[in-house]
Amino acid sequence: MIHIAWLGKKSPFCGNVSYGNTITKKLKGRGYKVSFIHFDNPTNKDFSPSHFLGNNPEVSLPYLIKSQVYTIPSPRAERDLRESLALLKPDVVHASLTLSPLDFRLPEICKELNVPLVATFHPAFDSKLRNLTASTQQVTYQLYAPALANYGKVIVFSSSQKQLLQKLGIDENKLVIIPNGVDQNIWKPLASFSNKHNLIKKKIGQARVFLYMGRIVSEKNIETLLKAWKQVKKNKL
């Protein structure tokens, strides 16, 4: 059984939390052992021998500040991370970036422990540079590129991301594109109309309804989405 140490987020809720929960659930369902390491208020049991003997142990790292965007770890967090990985002895470490300044220390830690290191790098990305926020996103990529070059593999979601990271000096062979996907077992048309569905139709009418769930930011390409919806209406598809 392959043992994966997954460094990710449990809170506060954001896309990174959803990504980590979804992927680790699928991995466990396929028989992989997953140890989830994240920032939280650790308890004494986190480093007890019995805790690390579980099938899917969870380890908490101490922090000073935690937000949806970034976490500032406590001074002892790096030591706790190193010790937990040494005790867990995973076959591979996966980091769902960006998390914290420890992202930059992971390559050295994993090299010392002789364990492969993989990252999913998915900070917000807008290649069109239409505003200050998009420019700030570019700075994030520039800041992380030297560290990512020391990871074994880096998963990105698009060819645009891959091309940018290549320009920033990361070997093409280290970059792997795995596009975002949709779980068709969850997101699918209703098999039958429910009372709730009928109530909604009663309120808004029988016209076709498009629903967007997400942040109102440029990298979500909402303008393109709206144009596509208008085209659907125009062509009566």
Regions picked out by a protein language model, each given a short descriptive name:
Residues 1-44, 113-115:
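N-terminal subdomain of nucleotide-sugar transferases
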Residues 5, 155, 204-230:
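Conserved donor-binding/catalytic core segment of Leloir-type glycosyltransferases
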Residues 48-82, 136:
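A short, charged, and often flexible helix/loop element on the N-terminal side
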Residues 92-115, 119-126:
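An aromatic- and histidine-rich active-site surface loop
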Residues 150-158, 176:
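A short beta-strand/loop micro-motif in the catalytic core of glycosyltransferases
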